[in-house]
Amino acid sequence: MKAKKWTFLLTSITTLALVTACAQSTSNTTASNSTATTTVTTNKKTSSYFTDKDYDTSYDEKTAATVTLSGSTATVSGDGVAVSGSTVTISKSGTYVISGQSDGVQIKIEAGSSDDVHIVLNSVTMTNTNAAISATSAGHVYLTLADGTTNSLSDSASNSDDKADAALFSKVDLTINGKGTLNVDGKKNNGIKANYTLHITGGTYNITAVGDAFNVNDELNITGTTMTIDAKEDGVKVDNDDDTSVGTMYLSDNTITVTAGDDGIHASGDLVIDSGTYTVKNSTEGLEGKSITINGGDITIYSTDDGVNAANKNAQQSEIFFTMNGGNLTVEVGQGDTDPIDSNGNITVNGGTIKMTGQSGFDFDGTATYTGGDIYLNGEKQTEIVNSMPGGGGAPGGSPQGNGGPGGGAPGGHP
């Protein structure tokens, strides 16, 4: 596997340091005597999450190679691109402007390991049996949605490539940017699948999938987008079962609406939300991450199980937590053994507003710390964070004006 990205490292260390300072053990809870609300906001430049090239949408039409799609074939011009029957192959670094409509054409990116390939979608409609665009080798692929254009990609239910079971597939680091629109229909399984990192820095997205809308392994960072997602399984997902230090997600300045058959927004590693509007209209679990840190934004969730779930069966309990520093979180859960906010580790609320609708509020295995912000359960303001599970982890976290209770019983929280 490639060397792991550093983009999430600084924030993960900072967040863990904050939580460690607030809760040193699973047998005690703490509460500040101050009424001040603490707000922690990640650097707005988001330099630790994105590179300058992630934002660069510029290209020179005069020097770029071109691919013009037409029916079951294409015509090409320029260096580094060739067509054979219904397959277009891009073999080296450069800029390639794609336009036209096709049915049965696949664009393959098979460049050198140090080659950066820039693809510009300029009013493209592609349907194919397997992935419409498949990047199997390159240094980095940058895909720009040309300003004002609408582009559509689809595979088929007969997609026979199990490793590239998506309409758009990348085995290498992928960036999507621009101010155009991308419609994606994942008919076999996933909408967009990336084996390593996926950074998105703009655009409008309409994604449907019979599996996951986004399926990423190591890192998924999204900013400045508008997305409408309808997935039979997970909506926005990054997951790596082999390494708990990756599987990370960062979200800022987006408007994302998700309808999902399973998790709405899922990270096996650290999930950070800085700003934006996120609506999970239907899900089994709304937000899930090894750790979940909300610094801002407006988040609305409906789920049939836990609304927010901090968990990872492969991680240490000290790595698992839910922290709310700012923003607005509204969670409604279905009937049964459900919790609006569930953490297999600690819960810390330093600021923001949490509104929960359900039979209970919090379920946690570690400790609860409440230093600022407002918490409501079924319309009633709460003065402390109370564990809903009998024999659960640490005792309640007191309100910003009060004191935490004594240590609770042995851990026994709902997974």
Report each predicted region and the residues it spans.
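A composition-driven surface/loop motif
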Residues: 2-415
